[in-house]
Amino acid sequence: YPPFSYLSNDSTPTGIDVDIATEAFARMGYAVRIEIIDWEQKTKLVESGAIDCIWSCFSMDGREQLYRWAGPYMVSRQVVAVNAQSHIETLADLAGKTMMVQSTTKPEEIFLAGTDPRIPQLGEVLSTENRSVQYAMLNCGYVDAIAAHETAVLQYMQDCNANFRILEEPLLVTGIGVAFALNDTRGLDEQLTETFAAMRADGTMKQIVGKYLPNPEKYLEVDALEP
């Protein structure tokens, strides 16, 4: 999920989340082992102890009671993207259109729930397990729009020279955090939250995010999020 977590050319896990995790856990006295998982099985894996935490640009909104959370450590904008020449300019213009989202994500939840008054009745909402399918479908014109993290869309546009346009009005502005199981009583969530604060204060967060994204400050304004 670039730029947060992905494999480099030599198949080494890298990205914003990998760098933050490595630094934060090192400060707490732990070494990090990155496990690539089936995202749809994430809750079962963390509850069973197969993994210690879920960490990959994971939005906290609406999931506050499902896990013990560390963070938020960054701000995320969930957005709608269309082809540059599309006549879709606002969320209201999505009426009757075909939307593709990644399964088990906040955009899927938002569009399937149909409770956001800003969003009209769509023609169809398609879900895919593979995020890259979204981009291919939009690129080929098989869907009218996709919805995802703004940073992921921007990364794809940069890497693949895709001629997409992001709607100005975001679907959701939320914090992203690290999820631990509710039955995890080790206190790692609280320690990690404190470590995040220290890393913001000493400039480490800005340095890490700035390696991957321009204007890193806007992604670190977690204190501005509504409680």
Task: Identify what each model region corresponds to.
Residues 41-44, 57-66, 110-113, 137-139, ...:
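A ligand-binding cleft/hinge motif common to bilobed small-molecule-binding domains
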Residues 41-42, 87, 106-107, 133, ...:
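Alpha-helix capping/helix-boundary segments
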Residues 75-82, 154, 158-197, 215-227:
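Periplasmic-binding protein-like
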Residues 15, 29, 48, 64, ...:
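Extracytoplasmic
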Residues 18-27, 88, 92-106, 178-216:
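Extended ligand-binding regions for polar small-molecule ligands
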Residues 1, 9-12, 58-60, 83-87, ...:
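Short coil/turn segments
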Residues 6-7, 21-30, 107-128, 157-161:
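Ligand-binding cleft/hinge of the Venus flytrap
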Residues 1-57, 65, 127, 191-192, ...:
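Extracytoplasmic small-molecule ligand-binding "clamshell" domains
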